[in-house]
Regions:
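Positively charged, small/polar-rich N-terminal and surface patches that mediate targeting and assembly
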Residues: 1-120
Length: 120
């Protein structure tokens, strides 16, 4: 059932697979930190090819495990949540790109009352 329909912020964090935070992959460290800080959720996507500010092409070849492949972390949050998030990113990211955009979120969850108050 639809339980949320409204405006939120989509944060996209673009980093490299070889980026580290205290000897741990940056994406894993960010996920752990965001969970610990009480954020609603985050998803990590591993790319198969890409290039960044230096125009160096990074690709996945069959004979190599990786060439510093792109990693995308997506977070959907409130505006206040994004305000809490930015200082964490400032602390943990040394190189990368972060975008924030306004999105319409429609959330469905089982066993909850729908927005119109009627059960189907």
């Amino acid at each position: 059932m639809r339980v949320l329909d409204g405006e939120q912020r989509l944060v996209r964090i673009f980093v490299g697979e070889s980026d580290r935070w205290h000897h741990q992959s940056l994406s894993s460290a960010l996920l752990e930190r965001l969970r610990r800080e009480g954020f609603a959720g985050a998803t990590v996507f591993h790319g198969t090819a890409g290039f960044g500010a230096r125009s160096v092409l990074h690709t996945a070849h069959l004979l190599r495990l990786s060439e510093d492949l792109p990693v995308l972390i997506e977070i959907v949050e409130t505006e206040d949540g994004v305000a809490r998030l930015i200082p964490i990113l400032d602390e943990m990211i040394t190189e990368g790109l972060v975008t924030v955009e306004t999105v319409r979120v429609i959330r469905y969850a089982p066993g909850t009352r729908p927005l119109d108050g009627k059960r189907s």
